[in-house]
Amino acid sequence: EHMDIVEEVARIYGYENIPVTTPASAMTQLKRGRKNRVINVLKDFLVSAGFFEVINFAFMGRKDIDNFLIPPSDSRSSSVSIINPISKDYGVMRTFMAPNVLKNIAYNINRGIKNIKVFELGKVFISNNENLPEEHLNLFLAMTGKEREYFWREQPGEYDFFDIKGIIEGLAERLGLVFEIKAGKEPFLENNRSADIYIDGKKIGWLGEVREDILRLYEIEQKTYCAEIGCSVILDRGVLDFQYRAIPRYPQAIRDFSFFVDEAVPVARLIDSIKNLSPLIVSVGVFDMFKKDKRSVSFRVVFQSFEETLRDETVNAIQQKIIDELTQIEGITLRV
């Protein structure tokens, strides 16, 4: 071969005798595409929140689909079989990411690492009859154990449903997206600790607490919270450039509201209703909740203007709108 002759001549002549020269062609920096930049932002956010990235095979066992109680009508039950699998535990292409990540968690727990926050960004494969399978890029998150190691001043709390929900909401905010989170019914999640994730009315994922009986199948004995999101919308619509505004010079006004709320009415729905009533409402939060004869929920609403100091009349008018809006909902009364 021509290159072999050149190499042999150079060896005989002596590599040290060949002068160093600058390449004739100009060096160009590779520009990352927009989607790769969104992925980097997504990963940076999760790492800054204390998550570690895991990478798994894109395979799973057929029994994993059965373990997670996926019904035949669900697209995630339509797996692509592998002709020559490395083992029966990896006999099909994965249709969702939970089984492999739960195995990662079990592996670490068995080695004494019990406080775990991990994520994986990878592809899932859905069978499409005689055609090539559909490939989707998904993001999977998992949290289990305590928030931190033991601390002399206080006992660290365990992760819960609201921790995984807060991470998903924070990710949406970082990417300039609006996720709508509603009560869900995934078969492998605990009742009342399960939610679906929507953008513009389209479901893109789920989050919640994995059922104890399913965790035991993977030798996990501690509560585990997970989420899985399809990334196509995120990559297309994620915002990379933000416009910052100055910290407001004018003081906030704070009002507290207490309502009796039926169990059937989601508190998140009430928070969204309050936020949408006025651009002067900058935050809404629940600061107290108790149940005696009825469930009582107390909200703290913060008002602020970037242009002027708010007058009492302005805040009082919005306050009355909040009361009128919420008391129109069936099952809600003002607590006096």
What role is predicted for each listed range?
Residues 2, 56, 65, 148-336:
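A carboxyl-terminal module marker
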Residues 1-116, 255, 302-304, 314, ...:
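Extended, well-folded interaction surfaces typified by the phenylalanyl-tRNA synthetase beta subunit core
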Residues 4-8, 59-64, 95-142, 224-240, ...:
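Conserved alpha/beta core surface patches that mediate binding of polyanionic ligands
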Residues 12-27, 78-83, 124-154, 249-256, ...:
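Residues forming anionic-ligand binding surfaces in small-molecule and nucleic-acid pockets
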Residues 28-36, 87-95, 111, 130-132, ...:
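Hydrophobic alpha-helical scaffolding
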Residues 11, 51-52, 87, 106-107, ...:
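Residue-level marker of positions within ordered structural domains that often coincide
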Residues 70-71, 107-108, 128-131, 185, ...:
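A generic local secondary-structure boundary/capping motif
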Residues 14, 50, 122, 145, ...:
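Glycine-centered flexibility sites
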